[in-house]
Amino acid sequence: MATILVDVVSAEASIFSGQAKFVALPGESGELGILPGHTPLITRIQPGAVRIEKEDGGEEFVFVAGGILEVQPQHVTVLADTAIRGTDLDEAKASEAKRAAEEMLQNQSSDLDLARAQSELAVAAAQLAAIARLRRKK
């Protein structure tokens, strides 16, 4: 079966690099599915789970806090603002971040505070959703 090279990188590290049969990730307008031979594309991605169906049939999950996706017919590159392997996600930490962002929303004093709180809340909620999705796969 045809495969596509997938690289998921953040400013800190390369999180995943390998051959895959399929990649699904959160785009601006909804979930994107990428197969080998996909039309070239550059777009922003939203906070959420990147699901990589590997060549051997296994799956890899990576949480991204947004970033840029570049697709070429035989290569997918995810340049993430922040990327965390699914196995390294911390539910307690994500829940606390969500609670703190909700509190910040209640106490915001400027448009900048509001935008920051909304952004942090979106990332925390997406991280919790990714954790729940990963649990369902186990």
From Swiss-Prot:
Location in or out of the cell: Cell inner membrane
A molecular-function term among this protein's GO annotations: ATP binding
Keywords: ATP synthesis, Cell inner membrane, Cell membrane, CF(1), Hydrogen ion transport, Ion transport, Membrane, Transport
UniProt topology in membrane: Peripheral membrane protein
A Pfam family assignment: ATP-synt_DE_N
GO cellular component terms listed in the entry, alphabetical order: plasma membrane; proton-transporting ATP synthase complex
Top-rank taxon: Bacteria
Keyword Membrane: yes
Predominant cellular place of this UniProt entry's protein: membrane
Record function comment: Produces ATP from ADP in the presence of a proton gradient across the membrane.
Protein family per UniProt: Belongs to the ATPase epsilon chain family.
Subunit (UniProt): F-type ATPases have 2 components, CF(1) - the catalytic core - and CF(0) - the membrane proton channel. CF(1) has five subunits: alpha(3), beta(3), gamma(1), delta(1), epsilon(1). CF(0) has three main subunits: a, b and c.
Protein known as: ATP synthase epsilon chain
Gene name for this UniProt entry: atpC
